Amino acid sequence: MSRRPDLLRGSVVATVAATFLLFIFPPNVESTVEKQALFRFKNRLDDSHNILQSWKPSDSPCVFRGITCDPLSGEVIGISLGNVNLSGTISPSISALTKLSTLSLPSNFISGRIPPEIVNCKNLKVLNLTSNRLSGTIPNLSPLKSLEILDISGNFLNGEFQSWIGNMNQLVSLGLGNNHYEEGIIPESIGGLKKLTWLFLARSNLTGKIPNSIFDLNALDTFDIANNAISDDFPILISRLVNLTKIELFNNSLTGKIPPEIKNLTRLREFDISSNQLSGVLPEELGVLKELRVFHCHENNFTGEFPSGFGDLSHLTSLSIYRNNFSGEFPVNIGRFSPLDTVDISENEFTGPFPRFLCQNKKLQFLLALQNEFSGEIPRSYGECKSLLRLRINNNRLSGQVVEGFWSLPLAKMIDLSDNELTGEVSPQIGLSTELSQLILQNNRFSGKIPRELGRLTNIERIYLSNNNLSGEIPMEVGDLKELSSLHLENNSLTGFIPKELKNCVKLVDLNLAKNFLTGEIPNSLSQIASLNSLDFSGNRLTGEIPASLVKLKLSFIDLSGNQLSGRIPPDLLAVGGSTAFSRNEKLCVDKENAKTNQNLGLSICSGYQNVKRNSSLDGTLLFLALAIVVVVLVSGLFALRYRVVKIRELDSENRDINKADAKWKIASFHQMELDVDEICRLDEDHVIGSGSAGKVYRVDLKKGGGTVAVKWLKRGGGEEGDGTEVSVAEMEILGKIRHRNVLKLYACLVGRGSRYLVFEFMENGNLYQALGNNIKGGLPELDWLKRYKIAVGAAKGIAYLHHDCCPPIIHRDIKSSNILLDGDYESKIADFGVAKVADKGYEWSCVAGTHGYMAPELAYSFKATEKSDVYSFGVVLLELVTGLRPMEDEFGEGKDIVDYVYSQIQQDPRNLQNVLDKQVLSTYIEESMIRVLKMGLLCTTKLPNLRPSMREVVRKLDDADPCVSNSQDTTGKITV
């Protein structure tokens, strides 16, 4: 008891001390709140790459990756996590970070809405959410009075273009472009942002005029309203914005002329007014803009001579003026004092000599001057232009010999001198252009031999030397070109044999050696080029028989006419090329069974004695040999028959318990392939690679090195007489005769015992539907645009073959992305002919085939499927490829499909086409290609069948959309090379 007062006294002292310490050092409640907010923020994100693994509950937020704290208070003031593959959504908990001044999450995959609670971050100065997948309307951010940088461009935001933006008068940078707003005008209130230096409103569905209030933004440095539908005359008031360094007005509907007052913009570095409706003569005053680096005015209606003052500019790097009506001589000094790297002056009416100084500073990479009227020789100075990557000066009137150094461009990917009047030889120096992928020299007057040095161009894909005066033999070194896909040497004076080494060109698709003086036989080794699709040897002096092995190829075109060939025409080749492909070969003949389909076409029927020489001694010898063979065959046959009888008895004894109702297997084999029936029919459920209402697909690895095949087991009845089996086999035989690299190869059909099996070639990369949904390392899509384009072209060619080159034509009736298979090189193959029909059996069926989302609208009220029904379905596939969307998605709305969605998005306005492109693969240099494919998809899905193109037209248009060959601007106004 005596100790209690002391204890009490000690307790009081401790309490007082603790209170004092709490007063001096209060607990960091703020830090706890911030940490909780940050972890709620983290939990709403999908961090598949573990970028936020340093965020640990035991640590201070100040050591978290991407977090910045105030050095004095320790409070969180910044979140910066750009381009780190984050997905998920932004948590409203961000509003608890009241001291936050920077929220920067650009270039991720974040979706959902911008949380309106963000306005509670009153100290926010930087809000950067550009290049994500945010959707919904923009919340009213005007309470953020301190905001200086607002960039939410490059998302999927919608709704109206908000006028409250004009109340944020501290803004220095404003980026709202590349979103999906409703059509609207630029609000006048933007003129109140007096501190604004950067304004980005491109692709915002804007219409109407540029409000005059914008021309009061005296601090403005960058003005970008490209890719809208802004109309009216070019604004003369823009000359008041003397601090401008960049003007982007491309792809609008501006009219009128460029005013001479443009000279006031003395700081201007980039000026892009391309793809409008501007006209008149460009003012000479443009030549006084000494800081100009980029000038693009392509795709307008400008006329007259191009301003000579551009020749005095010393900083100009990019000049793009194609598709106008400029005339006269091109200013001689352009490039003399400036470091040009890109020049496109194509599709004008320039005359006179070709400009001399475009590569004066040895930095020119892209030179496109096609389709003008330039004449004379190519200036010798270009022989030293080793920086060139892409050269296209075709379709002019250039003449004379090409300077030697011009052939050796070590970095060039493409050289196109076609459709001129150039002479001389193709120099052996061409072998030094080792990066070349396309050499296009057709329609000139080149002579001499094809240089052997072409064999050094190991990256070459296309060689076009047709319609010249070339002579000599085709060099065997061409066989070293492993990447070659097209070789056109037609209409020259080439002699000698077709080189056997061509078999080594394993990617060759298109081979044309027509109209030369080639002799000898067609090499049997050509059948080893599995990719070969088009073969033209017409108009030569070839002899011998047509190699039967050529039927192994997946040819869609063949022409051997006008030679001296003899012997039997393989029926499969006759089916591909028709009799005209073999005409003017007097010694060629067709089998009797093929004669009916080739009546009156000048082909004789093969005789069994056609090749026997008629001298008596040989006849006697042959007769003796024939009798000897008959005797041997008879004796052998007797032994074989006896052996077979014994074996049959043994088998009958072994199998006497087998159900007598089991039918024998009927095997229809369409390719030379060793198949074991038991191996095909003993399917393992572990190897199922696909299934549907019609049956299952199995992967089967054949023994004896037979490779891998896909076996489709079809559900069906018991196979009784009259159940349709005979018809099915007949149709399978038609499909089995198809020979096209873009149609899945059917090896065999097995029917019997109540089952039916189809044996197909195996496709390593599955189907297009799956591939479009796959991502690879880094979150990138498996299919970039180059792969998607390749798939589109291949599939189109396959369907075109079915429609136009098969006899009778075949209507697929179920074209869809899951029926387009992909091999190891992403070559597409049309597959699944379960509902396909040959056209000559009638166009009307008792039920509608096809898949919802792909079916043409006319099939809703008619069973008359036609080729145009397939075209519609293929159009849906094209829309899948360019948008990355599925045919049916919830976001389209009830009862809506991808066709409805795309049409509603562009609102019949072609200037909004970019809004529906898949941003995962979209880039400046392939945008034009994507838009062309999109337009073809829209044309194919036109409601009226008669307005849809044929598949041949589709193929032709898709060829024009090649992203690797485009010679013009993309629709963003950026140059496409």
From Swiss-Prot:
Name used for this protein in its record: Receptor protein-tyrosine kinase CEPR2
Protein's UniProt keywords contain Lipid metabolism: no
Tissues in which the protein is found: Expressed in mature leaves, primary roots, and the root tips of both primary and lateral roots.
GO CC terms: plasma membrane
Domain spans labelled Protein kinase: 683-965
Species of provenance: Arabidopsis thaliana
Any one Pfam family match given in the protein's UniProt record, by short name: LRR_1
Gene Ontology BP annotations: nitrate import; regulation of root development; regulation of shoot system development; response to mannitol; response to nitrate starvation; response to osmotic stress
